[in-house]
């Protein structure tokens, strides 16, 4: 198949469905016989898994959500480059001809997590899967955003603040590190950041009202948060 655009579209669709796998929900049911959507924030991500199902489920959710994002990129990069172009993976590097194609795959995996077709197009907020795709795409940016997240959470005790900082920082970092990358790649990185911020709209409202829950490794919740 020497059609890189078609192959990119196929990889994006596959990445969307891989990204959509709701590991937080699956693990909560497996280990705690709990539907984590029915307590806390109702989210299927790591933070709500921690609040509802505990550290074990949260750690596994974080790991698997990161891995599913990374796997999408690690598979798509050589596949699109070698099969679609007939060139080495350097064709997918930022600034090269095919850089935007990997950006599409990254975006598709994050959108799959946030708009999961397995859950009527409801899902998580995209932080863990986003970390996975960015680490696989260009790990120095991934690590810098992770550091930004950790510092913000350590200072404020709000996971949502760290998540928003990382989401806003992604397109800025991508443009700063790779100013000569394609507009397509920049657009994809910007859309990841914008979508993750949008997914945190309820958290933003709670932060402004002083109702956002702070990070706790010991406190469990069994009821939905007040809206």
Labelled PLM ranges:
Residues 122, 146-150, 182-189, 206-213:
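A cytosolic-side transmembrane-helix exit/cap motif
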Residues 143, 159-166, 180-192:
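Loop-to-transmembrane alpha-helix initiation sites
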Residues 12-13, 62-66, 107, 111, ...:
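Residue-level signature of the transmembrane alpha-helical core
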Residues 15-18, 77, 108-113, 149-153, ...:
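Alpha-helical transmembrane segments of multi-pass membrane proteins
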Residues 2, 18, 23-73, 114-127, ...:
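Interhelical loop and helix-boundary elements at the membrane-water interface
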Residues 50-54, 76-80, 108, 125-156, ...:
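Interfacial segments of multi-pass membrane proteins
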Residues 8-11, 15-20:
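Alpha-helical transmembrane segments and their membrane-interface boundaries
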């Amino acid at each position: 198949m020497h059609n890189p655009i078609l192959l990119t579209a196929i990889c994006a669709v596959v990445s969307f469905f891989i990204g959509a796998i709701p590991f937080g929900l699956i693990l909560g049911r497996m280990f705690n016989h709990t539907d984590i959507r029915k307590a806390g924030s109702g989210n299927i991500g790591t933070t709500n898994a921690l609040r509802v199902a505990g550290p074990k489920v949260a750690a596994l959710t974080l790991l698997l959500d990161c891995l599913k994002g990374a796997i999408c990129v690690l598979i798509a990069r050589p596949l699109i480059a070698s099969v679609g172009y007939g060139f080495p993976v350097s064709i997918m590097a930022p600034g090269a001809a095919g850089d935007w194609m990997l950006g599409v795959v990254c975006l598709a995996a994050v959108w799959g997590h946030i708009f999961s077709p397995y859950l009527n197009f409801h899902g998580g907020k995209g932080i863990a899967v986003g970390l996975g795709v960015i680490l696989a795409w260009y790990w120095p940016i991934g690590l810098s955003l992770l550091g930004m997240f950790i510092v913000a959470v350590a200072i404020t005790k709000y996971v949502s603040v760290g998540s928003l900082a990382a989401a806003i920082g992604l397109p800025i970092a991508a443009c700063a590190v790779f100013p000569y990358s394609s507009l397509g790649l920049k657009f994809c990185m910007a859309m990841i950041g914008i979508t993750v911020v949008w997914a945190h709209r309820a958290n933003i409202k709670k932060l402004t009202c002083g109702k956002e829950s702070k990070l706790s490794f010991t406190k469990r919740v069994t009821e939905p948060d007040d809206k």
